[in-house]
Regions:
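Long, low-complexity, Lys/Arg-enriched
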Residues: 1-407
Length: 407
């Protein structure tokens, strides 16, 4: 039932057979929950919510549910609240959950342009390529001293952005009872949004719907109680193994909107605020943009096709059923999968990697320290390991073993 014509190329088949079923199942689950909870207003968060909104508009038949596209990002919601609590501990709860954190990622988190602080960075014995391991980042005197010297600039910029965000949220009528929809994983943007609305005195009751809620959601529950709900896995309600973790980069790439991430907001007239975006990451690599678009177009084609099948209403597919094709590629990629998808670049808070990695085992034998750095940065670890080791090994089991060792 989930098979594409043999005449279609790899990316079309992948979009139709792997991404399409997941997107379709998630959309039906979302609509079911909105109706059961009688939620009449929903905001799809950029950028991952873009393709989900497209799927929603193909499937939803309830005209009483109004849907909107809210142009936000982790950065655009996080930076405006830094002035409320700019302690280093508060910042750590907002940083990327990656075990390896670059200085660029740190500056992205605080909303400042790293290039403007080159001299200050050098004074603190750091450079643009510096990175830190999460487990001992609190003990890095150079970084904590740098952060202390940046406090005034952080707060000043944060308050400016807070005022503009407040106006944008008012413009978009973000108030009352509503749902937000995004890819996942820990409710960070929901926390930042809820904290902003509470600070400006806007009544709100937010229900978050995600493709998954990861175990580290707990870090966002300290100062805000969040209503989180996950489709594939939901650690806020019950334990179910997070099987997308080893290929989170590939997974997130499938949901990307064809525009840059939201940076902040700017006033273009007395009554209008607009989102200011970063340049689109794939603008200089049109081939990768076309690959992602082709995959997404075929996923939507799958939804159109399956929605036209009357018999489909008699089937009861679980989230595991509809995730299985994508999971197979993510956890146990073939050499063809790695060749076709592994060279796609992945951008995450200032860091750029290729999904399948760049080097073979021979390189890491000569540069062993680089292996740890690259493995921690990589976002499709099963493909990375297979490309490096080549042998037919159980790479998902190896990944889980490495995770336990890391702890």
């Amino acid at each position: 039932m989930f098979k594409k014509k043999a005449s279609y190329d790899y990316y079309q088949k992948f979009g139709y057979e792997c991404f399409g079923p997941l997107l379709w199942g998630y959309t039906h689950w979302l609509i079911k929950n909105l109706k059961e909870r009688e939620i009449k207003k929903v905001y799809f968060l950029s950028r991952d919510g873009y393709i989900i909104q497209k799927a929603f508009e193909l499937v939803n038949s309830d005209s009483d549910i109004e849907n909107h596209y809210l142009e936000v990002s982790r950065r655009s919601l996080r930076v405006p609240i830094l002035w409320m609590d700019s302690s280093f501990e508060a910042l750590l709860s907002m940083l990327s959950i990656s075990e390896k954190i670059s200085l660029q990622s740190f500056f992205d988190c605080i909303g400042l342009d790293m290039d403007k602080y080159r001299e200050l960075i050098t004074e603190h014995h750091l450079n643009k390529d510096s990175f830190f391991y999460r487990k001992n980042i609190r003990n890095n005197i150079n970084l904590t001293n740098l952060y202390r010297h940046l406090q005034n600039d952080i707060k000043k910029n944060s308050q400016t952005e807070f005022s503009l965000l407040q106006t944008y949220l008012h413009q978009m009528r973000v108030e009352g009872e509503f749902a937000i929809v995004d890819i996942g994983w820990s409710g960070g943007m929901q926390r930042f949004l809820q904290k902003t609305l509470n600070k400006i005195g806007v009544e709100n009751h937010i229900t978050g719907f995600y493709t998954g809620v990861a175990p580290f959601y707990i870090r966002n529950m300290k100062d805000e109680k969040l209503n989180l709900n996950g489709y594939l896995f939901d650690y806020s309600h019950h334990y179910k193994e997070d099987e997308r973790s080893p290929f989170v980069g590939l997974y997130e790439t499938l949901f990307l909107e064809g525009r840059g991430s939201v940076k902040c907001y700017r006033k273009i007239s007395d009554n209008l605020i607009t989102a200011e975006r970063y340049p689109y990451e794939y603008k200089t690599n049109n081939n990768e943009y076309l690959i992602i678009k082709k995959i997404q177009d075929e996923a939507l084609k799958f939804i159109k096709d399956i929605e036209s099948m009357e018999i489909i209403k008699y089937f009861n597919f679980s989230s595991d059923d509809l995730f299985s094709n994508l999971k197979k590629v993510g956890l146990n990629p073939s050499w063809k999968d790695i060749k076709k998808l592994g060279s796609i670049h992945f951008f995450d808070e200032g860091e750029v990697t290729t999904l399948g990695g760049d080097h073979l085992l021979s390189f890491y034998l000569l540069h062993p320290k680089q292996l740890k750095k690259d493995l921690l940065s990589n976002r499709w670890k099963t493909a990375f390991l297979k490309k490096m080791l080549v042998l037919p090994l159980p790479y998902y089991k190896i990944y889980k073993g490495l995770k336990k060792y890391q702890k």
